[in-house]
Amino acid sequence: MKKSNNKNNHKNNHNNNQGGENIRVRSPRRGEIPGVVEQILGHGKLKVRCNDKQIRLCRIPGKMKKRIWIREGDVVLVKPWDFQSDEKADVIWRYTRTEANYLERRGFLKI
């Protein structure tokens, strides 16, 4: 296997979405609702305004706490609990600005 001499090879492989390239976005599946973070409450909890006009108390699962930082105004994907589904949910995905714009254009995000 031939090794490349170009030390900056990783820079050549970046996906630049400004050129009209296709992007892959995780779309909401059954039982998942997109929403916007309204307030960070601490201890891994957030208030999220969901697409169905409900404000839910959402928690960030342990596997996401240190890997993904969530701020107010971020677009997230939440999965309501089986019980208290109108009040509580888990955050399962955070979208980037580009992905959020794509969701809004496609009609998934109606906030």
Swiss-Prot record:
SUPFAM superfamilies: Nucleic acid-binding proteins (SSF50249). Residues 23-96 form the S1-like domain. Residues 1-30 are annotated as: Disordered. Keywords: Initiation factor, Protein biosynthesis. InterPro entries: NA-bd_OB-fold (IPR012340), RNA-binding_domain_S1_IF1 (IPR006196), TIF_eIF-1A (IPR001253). The keyword Cell wall biogenesis/degradation does not apply. Gene3D superfamilies: Nucleic acid-binding proteins. It holds the Pfam family eIF-1a. Residues 1-13 have a biased composition (Basic residues). GO terms for molecular function: RNA binding; translation initiation factor activity. The keyword Protein biosynthesis applies. Disulfide bonds: none annotated. PANTHER family: EIF-1A (PTHR21668). Belongs to the eIF-1A family. Seems to be required for maximal rate of protein biosynthesis. Enhances ribosome dissociation into subunits and stabilizes the binding of the initiator Met-tRNA(I) to 40 S ribosomal subunits. This is Translation initiation factor 1A. It comes from Methanosphaera stadtmanae (strain ATCC 43021 / DSM 3091 / JCM 11832 / MCB-3). The lineage of its organism: Archaea, Methanobacteriati, Methanobacteriota, Methanomada group, Methanobacteria.
